[in-house]
């Protein structure tokens, strides 16, 4: 699966699966640390991305790697590359 997918100019993100209810679709929450310009304190930002999971292999709680890809549907522009850590 991941051999056929290339990341030419897109971004790669690591996040946790928060939903797998749709067919061949997962929702991944990605956390980033951003430094506040005034307080000089790091703040945790979270964003959700819908990604294409062609084999329906992800479950809620899995840590996954996704890459930017051509649009699959209206909201899906990310593709699952690998499962880094399975949920317990």
Curated annotation (Swiss-Prot):
Gene3D superfamilies membership: Nucleic acid-binding proteins (2.40.50.140)
Key words, A-Z: Ribonucleoprotein, Ribosomal protein, RNA-binding, rRNA-binding
Keyword Ribosomal protein belongs to the record: yes
InterPro entries per the UniProt record, alphabetical: NA-bd_OB-fold (IPR012340), Ribosomal_uS17 (IPR000266), Ribosomal_uS17_bact/chlr (IPR019984), Ribosomal_uS17_CS (IPR019979)
The keyword tRNA processing appears for this protein: no
GO molecular function, one term: rRNA binding
GO CC list: cytosolic small ribosomal subunit
One GO BP: translation
Pfam families: Ribosomal_S17
Family statement: Belongs to the universal ribosomal protein uS17 family.
NCBIfam families per the UniProt record, alphabetical: PRK05610.1 (NF004123), uS17_bact (TIGR03635)
Complex formation: Part of the 30S ribosomal subunit.
Stated role: One of the primary rRNA binding proteins, it binds specifically to the 5'-end of 16S ribosomal RNA.
The protein, known as: Small ribosomal subunit protein uS17
Organism for this UniProt entry: Oleidesulfovibrio alaskensis (strain ATCC BAA-1058 / DSM 17464 / G20) (Desulfovibrio alaskensis)
């Amino acid at each position: 699966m991941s051999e056929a997918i290339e990341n030419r100019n897109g971004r790669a993100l690591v996040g946790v699966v928060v939903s797998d209810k749709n067919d061949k679709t997962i929702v991944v929450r990605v956390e980033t640390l951003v430094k506040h310009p005034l307080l000089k304190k790091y703040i945790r930002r979270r964003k959700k991305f819908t990604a294409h999971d062609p084999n329906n292999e992800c479950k809620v709680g899995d840590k996954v790697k996704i890459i930017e890809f051509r649009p699959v549907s209206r909201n899906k522009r990310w593709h699952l590359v690998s499962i880094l850590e399975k949920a317990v």
